[in-house]
Regions:
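C-terminal structural segments of small proteins and small subunits
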Residues: 71-98
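A broad, low-specificity signal marking well-ordered, structured residues that form hydrophobic/aromatic
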Residues: 3, 27, 87
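Generic, low-specificity signal for short hydrophobic/alpha-helical stretches with a mild N-terminal bias
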Residues: 9-13, 25-27, 59, 71
Length: 102
């Protein structure tokens, strides 16, 4: 499976991973809900479970993805500082309409 993160996201995720509560845990991207042809995603700290694939990114951060969820394959984790701070997780390989902000 595939996952990409931009530089800002890597910085923020590294900070999250260096906290005490993150000890021994990894970043998981998961689907909050599906709408037919696209999904909404979120992230949390978690430990690998039976069906997970640990996906290496080019930013030295490993991301947990449930290998049974085809919509998780190819997710893009981005972090923006403007117009407001926050993560945007999209999957362009699965979304027919290009991307949209929520």
């Amino acid at each position: 499976m595939n996952c990409k993160i931009n530089r800002n996201a890597a910085k923020v995720l590294k900070k999250m991973l260096s906290t005490e509560e993150a000890e021994g845990k990894m970043i998981r991207v998961y689907i909050t809900h599906m709408h037919g042809d696209h999904a909404h995603y979120d992230m949390k700290l978690d430990t690998p479970a039976e069906y997970d694939e640990i996906v290496k990114t080019d930013k030295d951060i490993d991301i947990l993805l449930d290998s049974r969820e085809e919509f998780l394959d190819g997710v893009w984790i981005k972090y923006f500082y403007v117009p407001e701070e926050g993560f945007e997780i999209t999957n362009l390989s699965k979304e027919p309409h290009g991307h949209h902000h929520h």
